[in-house]
Regions:
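C-terminal helix-rich "cap/oligomerization" subdomain common to oxidoreductases
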Residues: 1-11, 16, 76-79, 313-353
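N-terminal Rossmann-like dinucleotide-binding module
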Residues: 1-57
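Beta-loop-alpha module in the N-terminal Rossmann-like domain of NAD(P)-dependent dehydrogenases
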Residues: 47, 58-119, 306
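Basic phosphate/pyrophosphate-binding loop/patch that engages nucleotide-derived ligands
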Residues: 118-126, 140-155, 254-258
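C-terminal glycine/acidic-rich active-site capping loop/insertion
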Residues: 11, 132, 228, 251-329, ...
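Predominantly a Rossmann-like dinucleotide-binding segment in NAD(P)-dependent oxidoreductases
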Residues: 133-216, 223, 348
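Hydrophobic residues in well-ordered beta-strands that form the structural core
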Residues: 24, 64, 79, 101-102, ...
Length: 353
């Protein structure tokens, strides 16, 4: 069908490539099923048994090939397959005139991501990157406070995302030839994207990666030092080798007028704990450097599932012909930042963007 939806369309008809994994755990049940402006029509996965199970579970058609999926009556495709398959699958979808929402990272390399973006532009289809954490309501509330100047001049931001990810046979995140990298590209891409949402674009990066605990080819540890274009600094730390319950996935945002501190807002859940410490007046110098207590307030807007918000926002952009809120420019920029981080880790130098 044409890439342009009819004006009378009430719901975007979706297909999914890679129906297991994150699609089955999160995006289908939490995003597509309750979405008011989207309908899941068909799914395809390289594992036929998995695909049949998912199709039965969510009452969708089970396509027996990528070609069959693209021949179905669908408007858009959500790509949730392993990263090494993204490039060829996205190009096939673009040739078929299907709009695309692709999981991050877009590809293993900048060249792959650029090829995908160009193919979608030539085909006239929308191409989005699935950075769903942008839709977390506490993150959006924090961004609004910063945009209003409540934090003052941005000074420093930190984002952490960690989990325990032991060696698993054929796990693409554990082999850079398949996933492009390890903890950094898988989780650090979310963290850096969020910090740029708060503080603006990154100007330079310095990065260290390591295989600290696990012996698989990808890094299980990464720390990045960021310099933003506005002069603020930041750090991102991601680990596949810290037990889940030991890490609170911290988010820390500091400015000349205060701070916003959070735990567990970064991740697949839709709500954590976020507190703002924003004194009304600019503080004078205190020689004793006392720390006032009880001056913070909770940032606790009504939570909304991030996967649902993501699917509805992208679908609304298609139906209403509005700007894509998850533009592929965001994903391509993220890919370039990740490449700079890995180059820094390899060379021991700061890399300018």
């Amino acid at each position: 069908m044409s890439a342009r939806l009819t004006e009378t369309a009430a719901k975007v008809k979706w297909g999914i490539i890679g129906s297991g994994g994150i699609a089955r755990r999160r995006t289908i049940p939490e995003g597509f099923v309750p979405a008011r402006n989207a309908r899941l029509v068909a799914v395809w996965d390289a594992s036929a048994p998995t695909n049949k199970e998912v199709a039965n579970e969510f009452r969708a058609a089970a396509a027996d090939s990528l070609e069959a999926l693209l021949a179905a009556d669908i408007d858009a495709v959500y790509v949730a397959s392993p990263v090494q398959a993204h490039h060829d699958q996205v190009l096939a979808c673009a040739r078929a005139g299907k709009h695309l929402l692709c999981e991050k990272p877009l590809g293993r390399t900048v060249a792959e991501a650029e090829g995908m973006v160009e193919a979608c532009k030539r085909a006239g289809v929308q191409f989005g990157t699935a950075f769903m954490m942008r839709f977390q309501t506490q993150h959006q509330a924090a961004a609004k406070l910063i945009q209003e100047g409540r934090l003052g001049k941005p000074v420093y931001g930190r984002a952490q995302l960690s989990c325990w990810y032991p060696p698993i046979a054929n796990a693409w995140r554990q082999d850079p030839a398949l996933g492009g990298g390890g903890s950094l590209i898988d989780m650090g891409s979310h963290c850096i994207d969020l910090l740029e949402m708060f503080f603006g674009p990154v100007k330079s990066v310095s990065c260290f990666t390591n295989r600290t605990v696990h012996a698989y080819p990808s890094e299980d540890s990464a720390v990045v030092l960021l310099r933003f274009a506005n002069g603020a600094l930041g750090t991102v730390d991601t680990f596949f080798c810290i037990p889940d319950d030991s890490s609170k996935n911290a988010l820390e945002l500091y400015g000349s007028h205060g701070s916003i501190l959070a735990s567990d807002t970064i991740g697949q859940g839709s709500q954590g704990v976020m507190t703002a410490y924003l004194p009304a007046d600019e503080a004078g110098y205190q020689a004793q450097q006392g720390r006032a207590t009880g001056s913070g307030f909770k940032i606790a807007p009504e939570p909304r599932n991030t996967y649902l918000a993501e699917i509805e926002a992208f679908s609304a952009a298609l139906l209403e012909q509005k700007p894509n809120p998850l533009s592929s420019d965001i994903g391509l920029h993220s890919q370039k930042v990740m490449a700079a981080c890995y180059e820094s880790a390899r060379t021991g130098r700061a890399i300018e963007l």
